[in-house]
């Protein structure tokens, strides 16, 4: 074994990567790797999950004494010292020198070793990357190393408890880890033993290859299907085993449920190549190596695989011969062979293995399905040639954008017998696709705003529990596609009319349980000139009549289903009831809108010519916001009986709610909701000239209205599809009024609207409002009151930045702009505002509605948190109704109210106070028998008399205890036996003097210190007994053995630097608190002065024994005097007034103080 040396500083800073020991399997793995690097031929692992112990014994080269000194130190290793020998570093497992150091941080590590040819062995004990013991150990006779880990994760109780709660899982992970290592190192003997059950979990014998190990674990049948591989091509060498040519998959009809195991080709390959061809990713499992160039490596493996499989078997695929491969891999293998013949190095198979969107993946249902594991999007893109443009197809997960642009290059049918990459004989392929259509619930979907997809008819024998369906046929002609540009079909080879019977949209009506079984018919081929395409055509059922249901949860969804499914359990709606449930008496579909109306980007397909490519581009669809007969808003489409006058009265009031939210969404310009989608029927036309004055963006050949980019909101006239037009006023003040009326719980003539918050919930916590005057009164006046009365806004003492904002936001269109400007002028002059009066905000008579709404100023500041009576939703006033009660509070001094706060250049509240300001503090009289006021350095502060005296007594008692005056030793009547972990014995011996000084007297019986044997007898035997003879007595309180263990833990955490045990601190805090002055105790001025003088002498004068503050600064007198000096005249403000200093005034103040 090489010499252990510290890594150079340059190498150390270049790595910057640590090893995290997150479970016991990782600890075992690192120790086994060290044994393999030492050249061991036999490695024995002993594991105890409950006792949190691991022992690894090997017969390697061992460690010399000089190397043992550096062993376990961070950045000390024998495997890597310079970047120039990086080729040799790859031969070892871990070369940063951090494994043993990381293990010693979370456990007690013991290393016993004997080097080859050395007379003596050595022992080293470490904890926290620090050496606790290093000496000679002659118990080991043969060369090798024994590493023992005790008390694993002692500093991480959560991880330790989790590990001990599932010992079987931990043992299984360790067995799996060792098995993986044994496959690579078949010439080494491994054994894993559970010491708690004496059960041998895993054992291997040395062999020349891993074939015997595979035969034992995988079975004879599986091993017989493998063939040996050993091929060298230049710098690459691939050896191992892979599935032979006689492997056959199970038939798709016999696979059963999806949760059962399905057989697939297996392989175990070992790739040997120079170090410069790959890079380590350093991920925790150490199972990932990234090649710099994957192309040659993958191509080399492909050639080996194709060479082992018989050539005639592969050719049978072209003739529909034997089913050698899985159906999903058949076409891929054909393409791979064609590409390999042309000299291509990268197969389309790797492209198809990329991450596909969630909508393209099969649903995780327990359904019968075939072995076709190819992406189901191959039905949409039936071509072998894909164009990867930019980042459209990203290998990252959860990154799928509708901006993807796929060009389908159609091959010449005259030169080749295939169409879009499909075999000319497509019977077998269509059958496999038909099976997939029957078993795949999440079919290839094209859902955004309006979606169509390949779906089942109304006789398939399964229930759609999380999807809704449209059984109305959609007829699309060429002109309609050019006009609307809203339907996104990712199919090619469409005729003038495409008949799709159903539509399944992603995240549509959740919880909708359809009791109608659906079935598939044989797919029909839609023939187009020049080629053919596989597009299933499903027959229609003309007699079905659609219905429309809507639910609200993150958007609005439409569900059109057959009359055969009258029972449909809806998901949770927005307010316990649906928006509307009208009936349709025609086959025409309906388009509805939700509360949060968003315009979603959609994919529009341009069908310029069927012989050309189909491009998918991203646009923003424009909608026609119309007005119904009842004044409701909806998306404009062809006339539908659903929106006729007789049927509209049933859901009129509820639907008007959506109109207001529609106005709000249009005004705010929200970003599109990705889960918002619509369902539509045939002949849907969207008017692109809905709001001509809004900002529009030109995209392609059509103009689309980007509603989220609209900045101008004026009176718009929205054309209705009913043949008439209504004036729709989108006014920001009206929208805000509707919003505030809803949030305040008021009602209007459109019907009662429930609050989003449950009535059974407790009231909101009302935050403290610093900028509202104490004398501010919330009141309302009759609607006929004059808004220009001089006492309307007498006490609007809000801050300068917030006053105008609250006036503009709270006073809606009921208040004219002239009155707002007048209010701003009156607020700007501070002399016109009176000091204390009722605060009233008056609204004039409403013009648009009969319902009059009055809002107080506090409600505008926080409408949701306005005080309401719990369970009754009625306002409760927090101030007295009589104004004279408020005027009687003028004597209360509030430094954050009135003109004093508004005009202050500096805050009246001191930011902090230091201990030096207490030196010359002036003590005033006691307040409320609780506090001691002081004036320190121009700052008025109050001192908690209980907290201050508690701090004084605590430091006095602490000084006595540390001096040994208030503590004694109490001997126990009977010796108490202690059972400590192994680490406890070490700590008890290391810190025995400190423990004895405090009064714990222990009798430690030292037995023979023997080393660990192979059977781990030291872990199974009874720990060394320790008897406790005496305990300390602190201020008359006897401590216990539990306090001793707590002190040991503290010493271990602080490396012996702590002085006072935690139990002693608790006793001192309790005694100081019980003996201190309490609230309600009257104090003389002299006693107050003594408390302040004692507080000055303490080390922590601003904290009590429990950490709470003793002193709080109130007012900065210097800043207060500056502000009072700015007040003109002899005006009295909260009892403060500038007066001339006279003898009479001083005499009167003295008389008042005496009385």
From Swiss-Prot:
KO phenotype (gene knockout): Reduced fertility and meiotic defects: 60 per cent reduction in crossovers and delayed prophase I progression.
Biological processes, Gene Ontology terms: mismatch repair; reciprocal meiotic recombination
A Gene Ontology molecular function term of the record: ATP-dependent DNA damage sensor activity
Keywords: DNA damage, DNA repair, Nucleus
SMART domains, A to Z: MutL_C
CDD domains assigned to the protein according to its UniProt record, in alphabetical order: HATPase_MutL-MLH-PMS-like
Tissues in which the protein is found: Expressed in reproductive tissues.
Keyword field contains NADP: no
Gene Ontology cellular-component terms listed: chromosome; mismatch repair complex; nucleus
Pfam families (UniProt xref): HATPase_c_3 (PF13589), MutL_C (PF08676)
Location within or outside the cell: Nucleus
Complex and partners: Heterodimer of MLH1 and MLH3, called MutLbeta, which is involved in correction of a specific subset of IDLs when associated with MutSbeta.
Record function comment: Involved in DNA mismatch repair (MMR), correcting insertion-deletion loops (IDLs) resulting from DNA replication, DNA damage or from recombination events between non-identical sequences during meiosis. Component of the MutLbeta heterodimer, which probably forms a ternary complex with the MutSbeta heterodimer that initially recognizes the DNA mismatches. This complex is thought to be responsible for directing the downstream MMR events, including strand discrimination, excision, and resynthesis.
Family: Belongs to the DNA mismatch repair MutL/HexB family.
Name this protein carries in UniProt: DNA mismatch repair protein MLH3
Organism in which the protein naturally occurs: Arabidopsis thaliana
């Amino acid at each position: 074994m090489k010499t252990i040396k510290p890594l150079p500083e340059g190498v150390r800073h270049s790595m910057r990567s640590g090893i995290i020991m997150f479970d016991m399997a990782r600890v075992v793995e690192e120790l086994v790797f060290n044994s393999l690097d030492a050249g061991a031929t036999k490695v024995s692992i002993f594991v105890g999950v409950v006792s949190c112990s691991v022992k690894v014994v090997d017969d390697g080269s061992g460690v010399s004494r000089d190397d043992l000194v550096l062993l376990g130190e961070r950045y000390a290793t024998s495997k890597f010292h310079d970047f120039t020998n990086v080729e040799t570093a790859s031969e070892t497992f871990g070369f940063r020198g951090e494994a043993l150091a990381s293990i010693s941080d979370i456990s007690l590590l013991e290393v016993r070793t004997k080097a080859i040819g050395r007379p003596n062995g050595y022992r080293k004990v470490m904890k926290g990357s620090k050496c606790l013991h290093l000496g000679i150990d002659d118990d080991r006779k043969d060369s090798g190393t024994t590493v023992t880990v005790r008390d694993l994760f002692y500093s991480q109780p959560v991880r330790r408890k989790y590990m001990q709660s599932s010992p079987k899982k931990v043992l299984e992970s360790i067995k799996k880890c060792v098995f993986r290592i044994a496959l690579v190192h078949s010439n080494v003997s491994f054994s894993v033993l559970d010491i708690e059950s004496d059960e041998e979990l895993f054992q291997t014998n040395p062999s020349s290859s891993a074939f015997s190990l595979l035969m034992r674990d995988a079975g004879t049948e599986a091993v017989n299907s493998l063939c040996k591989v050993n091929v060298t091509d230049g710098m690459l060498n691939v050896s191992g085993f892979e599935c032979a040519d006689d492997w056959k998959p199970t038939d798709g009809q016999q696979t059963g449920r999806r949760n059962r195991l399905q057989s697939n080709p297996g392989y175990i390959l070992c790739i040997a190549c120079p170090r410069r061809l790959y890079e380590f990713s350093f991920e925790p499992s150490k199972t990932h190596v990234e090649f710099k160039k994957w192309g040659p490596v993958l191509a080399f493996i492909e050639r080996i695989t194709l060479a082992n499989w018989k050539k005639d078997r592969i050719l049978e695929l072209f003739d529909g011969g034997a089913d050698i491969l899985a159906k999903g891999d058949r076409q891929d293998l054909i393409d791979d062979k064609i590409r390999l013949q042309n000299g291509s190095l990268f197969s389309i198979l790797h492209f198809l293995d990329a991450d596909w969107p969630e909508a393209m993946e099969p649903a995780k249902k327990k359904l019968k399905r075939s072995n076709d594991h190819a992406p189901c999007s191959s039905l949409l893109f039936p071509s072998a040639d894909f164009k990867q443009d930019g980042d459209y197809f990203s290998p990252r997960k959860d990154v799928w954008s509708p901006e993807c642009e796929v060009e389908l290059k159609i091959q010449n049918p005259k030169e080749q017998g295939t169409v879009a990459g499909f075999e000319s004989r497509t019977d077998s392929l269509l059958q496999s696709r038909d099976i997939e259509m029957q078993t795949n619930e999440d079919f290839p979907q094209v859902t955004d705003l309006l979606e169509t997809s390949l779906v089942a008819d109304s006789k398939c024998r399964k229930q759609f529990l999380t999807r809704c369906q449209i059984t109305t046929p959609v007829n699309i002609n060429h002109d309609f596609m050019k006009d609307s540009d809203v339907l996104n079909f990712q199919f090619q080879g469409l005729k003038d009319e495409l008949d799709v019977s159903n539509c399944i949209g992603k995240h549509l009506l959740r919880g909708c349980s359809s009791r109608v079984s659906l079935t598939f018919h044989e797919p029909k081929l839609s023939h187009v000139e020049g080629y053919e395409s596989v597009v299933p055509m499903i027959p229609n059922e003309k007699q079905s009549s659609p219905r429309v249901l809507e639910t609200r949860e993150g958007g609005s969804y439409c569900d059109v289903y057959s009359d055969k499914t009258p029972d449909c359990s809806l998901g949770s709606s927005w307010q316990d009831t649906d928006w509307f449930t009208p009936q349709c008496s025609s086959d025409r579909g309906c388009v509805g809108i939700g509360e949060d109306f968003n315009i979603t980007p959609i994919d529009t397909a341009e069908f310029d010519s069927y012989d050309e490519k189909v491009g998918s581009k991203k646009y923003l669809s424009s909608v026609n916001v119309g007005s119904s007969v009842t004044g409701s808003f909806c998306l404009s489409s062809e006339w539908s009986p659903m929106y006729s006058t007789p049927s509209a009265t049933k859901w009129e009031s509820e639907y008007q709610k959506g109109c207001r939210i529609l106005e709000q969404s249009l005004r705010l310009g929200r970003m599109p909701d990705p889960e918002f989608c619509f369902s539509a029927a045939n002949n849907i036309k969207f008017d692109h000239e809905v709001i001509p004055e809004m900002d529009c963006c030109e995209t392609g050949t059509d103009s689309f209205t980007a509603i989220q980019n609209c900045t101008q909101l004026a009176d718009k006239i929205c054309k209705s599809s009913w043949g008439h037009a209504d004036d729709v006023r989108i006014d920001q003040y009206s929208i805000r009024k509707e919003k505030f009326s809803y949030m305040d719980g008021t009602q209007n003539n459109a019907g009662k609207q429930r609050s989003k918050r449950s009535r059974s919930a407790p009231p909101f916590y009302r935050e403290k409002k610093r900028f509202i005057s104490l004398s501010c009164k919330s009141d309302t006046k009759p609607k006929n009151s004059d808004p220009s009365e001089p006492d309307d806004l007498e006490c609007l003492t809000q801050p300068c930045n917030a006053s105008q904002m609250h006036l503009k936001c709270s006073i809606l269109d009921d208040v004219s702009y002239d009155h707002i400007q007048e209010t701003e002028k009156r607020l700007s002059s501070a002399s016109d505002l009176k000091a204390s009066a009722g605060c009233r905000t008056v609204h004039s008579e409403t013009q648009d509605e009969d319902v009059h709404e009055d809002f107080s100023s506090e409600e505008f500041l926080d409408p949701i948190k306005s005080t309401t009576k719990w369970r009754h939703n009625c306002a409760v006033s927090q101030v007295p109704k009589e104004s004279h009660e408020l005027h009687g509070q003028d004597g209360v001094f509030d430094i954050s109210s009135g003109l004093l706060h508004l005009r202050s250049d500096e805050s009246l509240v001191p930011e902090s106070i230091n201990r030096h300001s207490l030196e010359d503090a002036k003590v005033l009289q006691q307040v409320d028998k609780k506090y001691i006021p002081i004036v320190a350095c121009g700052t008025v502060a109050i001192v908690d008399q209980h907290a201050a005296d508690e701090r004084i007594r605590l430091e006095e008692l602490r000084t006595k205890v540390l001096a040994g005056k208030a503590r004694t030793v109490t001997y126990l009547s009977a010796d108490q036996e202690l059972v400590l972990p192994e680490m406890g014995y070490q700590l008890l011996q290391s810190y025995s003097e400190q423990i004895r000084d405090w009064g714990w007297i222990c009798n430690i019986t030292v037995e023979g210190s023997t080393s660990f044997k192979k059977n781990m007898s030291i872990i199974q035997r009874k720990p060394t007994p320790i008897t406790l003879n005496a305990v300390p007595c602190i201020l008359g309180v006897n401590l216990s053995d539990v306090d001793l263990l707590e002190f040991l833990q503290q010493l271990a955490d602080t490396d012996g630097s702590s002085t006072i045990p935690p139990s002693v601190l608790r006793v001192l805090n309790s005694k100081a608190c019980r003996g201190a002055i309490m609230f309600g105790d009257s104090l003389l001025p002299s006693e107050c002065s003594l408390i302040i003088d004692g507080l000055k002498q303490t080390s922590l004068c601003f904290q009590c024994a429990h950490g709470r503050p003793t002193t709080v600064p109130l007012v900065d007198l210097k800043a207060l005097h500056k502000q009072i000096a700015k007040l003109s005249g002899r005006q009295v403000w909260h009892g403060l007034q500038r007066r001339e200093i006279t003898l009479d005034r001083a005499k009167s103040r003295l008389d008042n103080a005496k009385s």
